[in-house]
UniProtKB/Swiss-Prot annotation:
Alphabetized InterPro entries for the sequence: Ribosomal_bL12, Ribosomal_bL12_C, Ribosomal_bL12_C/ClpS-like, Ribosomal_bL12_oligo, Ribosomal_bL12_oligo_N_sf
GO cellular component, one term: cytosolic large ribosomal subunit
Keyword Ribonucleoprotein assigned: yes
Keywords: Ribonucleoprotein, Ribosomal protein
GO biological processes: translation
Organism of derivation: Frankia alni (strain DSM 45986 / CECT 9034 / ACN14a)
Protein name: Large ribosomal subunit protein bL12
Length: 130
């Protein structure tokens, strides 16, 4: 097989449907043992034993998890919101909603967590942000 350039790959992806792309991503993840989750910057932890009192005693939390506690009676609307927030497929979003309580988003900024909480609550779900 000839080596494809990045541009040729992008052109090929543009011709695929979302369902085909979703299947491709799953196969890619399985083949290479990776996930398509967005990378999150990790702050370096201070050395054990401490080098003095440089770190504040209580740091403000900057990463939040959005937990779907319960669905309510508008299950279809909640599934639609979960799909919009996570770009999961229909089956995966339904499984997540059916398995509540479960995290919908993990390690996101406060603004994104609040926006997701508002969207899910607007669809009728009960949500907590941790």
């Amino acid at each position: 097989m000839a080596k494809l350039s990045t541009e040729e790959l992008l052109d090929a992806f543009k011709e695929l449907t979302l369902l085909e792309l979703s299947e491709f991503v799953k196969q890619f993840e399985e083949t290479f043992g990776v996930t398509a989750a967005a990378p999150v910057a990790v702050a370096a932890a201070p050395a054990a034993g401490g080098a003095g009192g440089e770190a504040p005693a209580a740091e403000e939390q900057d990463e939040f998890d959005v937990i779907l506690e319960s669905v309510g009676d508008k299950k279809i609307q909640v599934i639609k919101e979960v799909r919009a927030l996570t770009s999961l497929g229909l089956k995966e979003a339904k499984d997540l909603v059916d398995g509540a309580p479960k995290p919908v988003l993990e390690k996101v900024a406060k603004e994104a967590a609040d926006k997701a909480k508002a969207a899910l609550e607007g669809a009728g779900a009960s949500v907590t942000v941790k």
